[in-house]
Amino acid sequence: MMKMTKIEKAVTWALAIANDNTHGYDQQYRWGPDYDCSSLIISAWQQAGVPVKTKGAAYTGNMKSAFLACGFTDVTSRVNLRTGNGMKRGDVIINTLHHTVMYIGNGRIVAARINENGKVSGGKTGDQTGMEIMVQDYYFYQYGWDCVLRYMKEDATTDISSPSAPAASSESENVRK
């Protein structure tokens, strides 16, 4: 069994979701198989063994406090929000009112963006466009980024058997009727 840092496991999980078109964007059905921006990032870290959802992270507005309680540090003053300089793989970038993404390195981020209709809910399950959840170049968000959070327990590892397939959710709130 391979050992992987929690940072790498969170990034790998988010990338697997972005690269699997059975997962799309939806704010109503957001805990799998579809995700919105915050549930994607929260789920990636929860799957990596960092209990951010358990500690109360549920949307962009309360992510920061839950992530800080789980070993993240606010490194906003150490990075350039306009260019992305100083960011590291796994950094969580947040605008507390609107959006969140994860920095994956080399000037790239993984993000859940919008559904196939250009809306936040009401689309079909899965990624219809290949752009609902995707990897893209880092950008300075139109409303500005509020903070960058970095997981500082980098020596913490977790066993993994497969870095790709996320577990299916059994939460009833995720089932479309």
Locate predicted features.
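Surface-exposed intrinsically disordered loops and tails
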Residues: 65, 69-80, 120-139
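Catalytic Cys-His active-site segments of thiol-dependent hydrolases/isopeptidases
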Residues: 54, 102-136
